[in-house]
Amino acid sequence: DVHIYNDEIRKYGNVNNNILSFFDTGITTTNAVAFSKTNDLSAFRVSVSDMRNWDIVPESELSRTSVSFKGNTQLSKRLTVEAQATYSYESVQNRPALSDSPSNLGNALIGIAPSFDQKWLSSNYKDETGRYNDWNGDKYRINPYWVINEMSNKSKRDRLIGQGRLYYAFTDYLKASFKAGLDSYTFRFTDFTPMYTPGFTDGMMKEMTNNVMQYNFEMMLRFQKRFGDFDVSAFVGGNVMRYEYESMIQTGQTQVIPGLQDITNYSSIETEHALVRKAVRSLFGQVSLGYKEFAYLDATFRNDVSSTLSPKNRSYFYPSVSGSLIFSNLFEHKEWFTFGKLRASWAKVGGDTSPYQLQLEYGLKPYTNKGTSLGYITSGSVPNANLKPTSTYSFEVGMDVRFLDNRLGLDFTYYQQITKDQILSLPVSQSTGYSRAMINAGEISNKGIEAS
């Protein structure tokens, strides 16, 4: 017999399946139903799915419900409409903590001796007054039964992804389209740590709400026609993208009424608010030419205007051109020579940066000085008002030949890529008051040969 941490007497001996017996058998169920209908002019499909998961960790579960719709209809000989949308709702109770969190169940369980039955902790994790029973003197390994029975967290997420398209055919070879897309979700998370928890003896509660929305509007005009031996296709279009992220976090310290899970039940409440916005306007196009199914030429262009760059640098243009020649079509068919193609391409690609890298960012401290709010610089990085877009230039030539009915072949490529004005956050001396600085860095080049 041995005395355990609360002076109870228990039998001494090795405990079989000591850690395994703490966990439950995980169960996941999925149910789905779908409806669809089609006729000569229209088609649609609606589906509903529901997933429930009861985790191996006691008191932890997840549920997710999704509803999807997809349909199209031909309103006239020239006009067609398509739409699709998916809505999902997810609810999670008590996500298990990970890594070095004090409430990580694994950290506490792996530290239990083989002769100490973890079930002894289940009836002694708190005393008769509701206070935590300190079983090991380690605030980083909290009693796992206190974690699952007294501490709690929950989250809910709503997400809507939708897209609608209009197609209009002016002629058989000239068509226009308009597309609008939306991706929006709200994530709400609450984390409750009761009074007397090691490391949080006064209690703590955190509520977080994240709202994210991104939408795109795009218009395109397409042309495709054959002129004698030439195949011609082209399109030109424009796109507008807007992104917005908003976060609100409230943290309550020092609980007033023990056990009451409400953010107003704390004597100290800190609020953090963040708002990030980005917009990109684009114009793009492509022309493709084909001659007698052996010579091809493609040219593209794109011009982006990004809100994350300074007015003089926010518009950047990047084109490309590529061509190929299937020279095997120039000769009479040979049994030993199956296929041969030469190809070459050149392209430029541009890129912007994340929002708010051009100027200092400011925030307010949660406390005041004689009733006056205190402001501060929130970023630890030196901004750069003259950031340029990153540019990557690539060049490639190659040959693909095959013999003996594709039994033998050689694919050879030479490539070169040069990246200029990379946008980097580099470390600087902290004596400057900052830890990093935003810069456009020099030039990086790589080239090589590939053969297979």
What kind of region is each of these model predictions?
Residues D1-N14, D55-S60, S66, K70-R159, ...:
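Surface-exposed loop/interface segments of Gram-negative outer-membrane beta-barrel transport/assembly proteins
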Residues N16-G26:
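Periplasmic N-terminal accessory/gating domains of Gram-negative outer-membrane beta-barrel systems
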Residues F22-F23, T30-R52, I56, S68-Q74, ...:
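Predominantly transmembrane beta-strands of Gram-negative outer membrane beta-barrel pores used
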Residues T28-T30, L62-S68, S282, Y316-S320:
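Transmembrane beta-barrel architecture of outer membranes
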Residues V33-K37, F69-T73, G162-Y168, M219-F223, ...:
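Residues on the lipid-exposed face of transmembrane beta-strands in outer-membrane beta-barrel proteins
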Residues K37-N39, D50, T73, L166-Y168, ...:
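Residue-level signature of outer-membrane beta-barrel architecture
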Residues V256, K278, Q286-E293:
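Active-site-adjacent "gating/activation" loops or surface patches in catalytic cores
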Residues P311-S315:
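Short glycine/threonine-rich loop-to-helix capping motif typified by GTGT followed
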